[in-house]
Structure formats: structure tokens, C-alpha cells
């Protein structure tokens, strides 16, 4: 049923929480691409690659944070700058299709949390251009906006998607 409803779903793997889902997605992207760097925006749990870039980074070796790079939500230029800087060694782009932690849009509007000016379509295009796995973290958005996740609403199909919360409650 899930495979029929979610645009990117060809297979489904269940885990116990959203943190495990995003960890597995990033690990899979690294395995498939043989690349190291992760480009992200938004919140993605407590795994070392993400939390190493926050103020709660105690106990995480610097070497881990060297492979994680934050870009600004709704800012295509900040993402492409990272894709250029780490070209040939980017495993994935992971983001929440609607950001709950990136409150300011750097494009035109203020306090924007929803994609502006085709942002998600541009992210998809950049992922294809640079041969990078695109992951939507739909832990919060999945099944709340649509049975097919926010990807169904916005018309952008990621390579991988992570769902949690609404599917279990």
C-alpha cells in the first residue's frame, strides 16, 4: 500500500524512529555513491553527522563534522556553492521539504518555511546535475499534507524519503 501511494517508493524499510530512518538513508546514499559529504538543511535527529554541526556537538570527533555541510533552506545558491566545493565527493542532499527549523527564507519573503520560487524543483535539478542522491526527510510532513507525503503535493520526487510520526500515530 505504501509503495502505491508514495511517489518515490519502490521498496519500504521499517525502522523504529525517524532518527534511524534518516541515518539509514544517508548510509545508503554513501554506500551507493561511494562519496562522503552530506549537504543538509533542517533538523534530522541525533546522529553524529547532523548533531556535529549544532551546539550539542560534544563528544563527536571533528573528522565526522568535516563531512557535513549545512545550506540555507530556499537558497539554491548556497546549495550549489557546496556542490561545487565538494564536487565528486557528495553522497546526498537531505532536507525537510517544509522546514520546521529554518524560519527565514533568503530569497524574497520573511519567515518563510515553505518552498519559494520552485526551490525543491531546483534542488532536484541540482541533485541530478551533480549525480547526488536526494533525500526528503518527511518525518514531520509525511502523511500530514497528503497520503503521498509532501513530495506528492509539490510534484518533486526524491530518490529516497524518510517517514515517521504520522505513520505510527
PLM-predicted stretches and their roles:
Residues 3-92, 99, 109-110, 118:
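PLP-dependent aspartate aminotransferase-fold enzymes
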